[in-house]
Amino acid sequence: MARIAGVDLPRDKRIVIGLTYIFGIGNTTAQKILANAGVSEDIRVRDLTPDQEEKIRAEVDQIKVEGDLRREVSLNIKRLQEIGSYRGMRHRHGLPVRGQHTKNNARTRKGKAVAIAGKKK
């Protein structure tokens, strides 16, 4: 099993799909990494040679991924909260940040619906 950026990539998947298991690498970024490393997208993770793994690791090391990226995102959110911006307040209260309506929906962000006591006839 190939281990890149601290993540074990699934052996049976194509390398372009396997790279997307790393936080911060999507499909487009995975394709660019493989193009720069000179590795075919169709090769399976289990079929990678050690030389190809090293080339991919070198490319991934140039990108901010996993822990560093998670830390940066959390610091950005914390900064928004500290300066008291509208977006920071929405993060603090657990509401949608990007202008979505919340009258009926937004259950994912607001959590499970809580019944109001005394609402019966």
Curated annotation (Swiss-Prot):
**Keyword presence, Repressor:** no
Which Pfam families would you find in this protein's record? Ribosomal_S13
Against PROSITE patterns, the record matches this protein to:
RIBOSOMAL_S13_1 (PS00646), RIBOSOMAL_S13_2 (PS50159)
Biological process (GO) annotations held by this record are:
translation
Residue intervals passing through the bilayer: none
| tRNA-binding found in the keyword field | yes
- Alphabetically ordered keywords of this record: Ribonucleoprotein, Ribosomal protein, RNA-binding, rRNA-binding, tRNA-binding
Give any GO molecular function from the UniProt entry.
structural constituent of ribosome
What does this protein's UniProt record list under function? Answer: Located at the top of the head of the 30S subunit, it contacts several helices of the 16S rRNA. In the 70S ribosome it contacts the 23S rRNA (bridge B1a) and protein L5 of the 50S subunit (bridge B1b), connecting the 2 subunits; these bridges are implicated in subunit movement. Contacts the tRNAs in the A and P-sites.
Task: Please give the family membership noted in the entry.
Answer: Belongs to the universal ribosomal protein uS13 family.
Kindly provide the name given to this protein in its UniProt entry. Answer: Small ribosomal subunit protein uS13
Native species of this protein?
Answer: Limosilactobacillus fermentum (strain NBRC 3956 / LMG 18251) (Lactobacillus fermentum)
